[in-house]
Amino acid sequence: NARHFRERMSSAGFDLRPGNHPIVPVMLYDAKLAQRFASELLEEGVYVIGFFYPVVPQGQARIRTQISAAHSIAQIDRAVDAFIRVGKRLGVI
């Protein structure tokens, strides 16, 4: 599931931290953007957390996602589609 999420998000143009684990950081680098992105995703029905300083170093703000084996491919695709809509709206992709 995490691989599917990573592949779709990368193909859409998102900057992801490398790794092979269920926690997938989506890098946005700006704290206010991360907060707004998380808020707009919630409006889309997708709950994520924006991490920014002091939780992560300044300039390294991100959206923290955690993909589970319990998520269906349809749920993951729905989340990615929401990321894409918000990402385009906010000029991230």
List each language-model region with its residue ranges.
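PLP-dependent enzyme catalytic core of the Aspartate aminotransferase-like
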Residues: E43-Y47, P54-I93
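Conserved PLP-binding catalytic core of the aspartate aminotransferase-like
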Residues: A2-G45, V55, G59-Q60, I67-A69
